[in-house]
Amino acid sequence: MDTQDMTAFPHRHLLGIEGLTATDVELILDLADGYVEQNRSPGRKSAILSGLTVVNLFFENSTRTRTSFELAAKRLGGDCINMSSDGSSVKKGESLIDTAMTLNAMHLDVLVVRHQESGAPLLLSSKVNCAVINAGDGAHEHPTQALLDALTIRRHKGTLRGLTVAICGDILHSRVARSNIHLLNIMGARVRVVAPPTLLPGAVDRLGVEVHHSMATGLKDADIVMMLRLQLERMQGQYLPSQREYFRFYGLDYDKLAVARPDALIMHPGPMNRGVEIDSLVADDIHRSVILEQVELGVAVRMACLDLLTRGHRGTGA
């Protein structure tokens, strides 16, 4: 893929959606669009990252995100190393900063970080010489997920501006929700959050969203219905009476979906809890569900991010 005519990215790191402009977002999405087509062609690999090293440093479990970043690096011709906390000296008591500085001494080019503590990627970005990408930090942000969601929506709807997007479920613990709220507001969408009061953060309305406690009102005439899983690993059991009761009121099925627009897209960042936040028939609806397309486009978005953040190492025409 030829990137010589692409604009330089004005940020050294990608730590969150907050702080990006609409121009920044469009730049990433436009570049990712090209990578979607490259990934669908027989010759998927290029040499844009040839000679560069990407390290995935994950302190939380991941299937989609880590594999997606690994594929993205390899399809751009880069070297990729996967590290987890279980396989590192963190298990022996080494601090996060010492781990990062040790990796930095080995002259890596991009550090992709997932950590259970909000702000960990920001801290690391001040200690290393390479680009840092936030792959999810606590309940703070998950920028590449919001970007791939935006690309999925744009490819179906043509634009994000003016769309009504309902984000439903465990908003309180969701970094995906926060990144999507920031991005959708930047791009001119109308954002609703739909959840029981116990699964909403305090002062959520200050984020520029409409707050709904009922799926009937929250999904009314929505263009996009984005479901979130219950993050039980971050709960202590006091947030909801039972998963069955939760599905009755907040699980997406065809009855609840009926109030949304007839062409509304169904989205989910994964992993899904079928029968808890979404019914299997809805999740697998080939006409309305774009859940697997989100996974596909995630690779292209992460390729675009790696491309843009390494241009200072190799020049924009590499």
UniProtKB/Swiss-Prot annotation:
It comes from the Bacteria. This is Aspartate carbamoyltransferase catalytic subunit. Catalyzes the condensation of carbamoyl phosphate and aspartate to form carbamoyl aspartate and inorganic phosphate, the committed step in the de novo pyrimidine nucleotide biosynthesis pathway. Gene3D superfamilies: Aspartate/ornithine carbamoyltransferase (3.40.50.1370). Keywords: Pyrimidine biosynthesis, Transferase. The lineage of its organism: Bacteria, Pseudomonadati, Pseudomonadota, Alphaproteobacteria, Rhodospirillales. It catalyses: carbamoyl phosphate + L-aspartate = N-carbamoyl-L-aspartate + phosphate + H(+). Carbamoyl phosphate binds at R64, T65, R114, H142, Q145, G270, P271. Pathway: Pyrimidine metabolism; UMP biosynthesis via de novo pathway; (S)-dihydroorotate from bicarbonate: step 2/3. GO terms for molecular function: amino acid binding; aspartate carbamoyltransferase activity. Transmembrane segments: none annotated. It comes from Rhodospirillum centenum (strain ATCC 51521 / SW). PANTHER family: ASPARTATE CARBAMOYLTRANSFERASE, ORNITHINE CARBAMOYLTRANSFERASE, MITOCHONDRIAL. It holds the Pfam family OTCace_N. Its EC number is 2.1.3.2. The keyword Zinc-finger does not apply. Belongs to the aspartate/ornithine carbamoyltransferase superfamily. ATCase family. One of its GO terms (cellular component) is cytosol. It is an enzyme of class 2 (transferase).
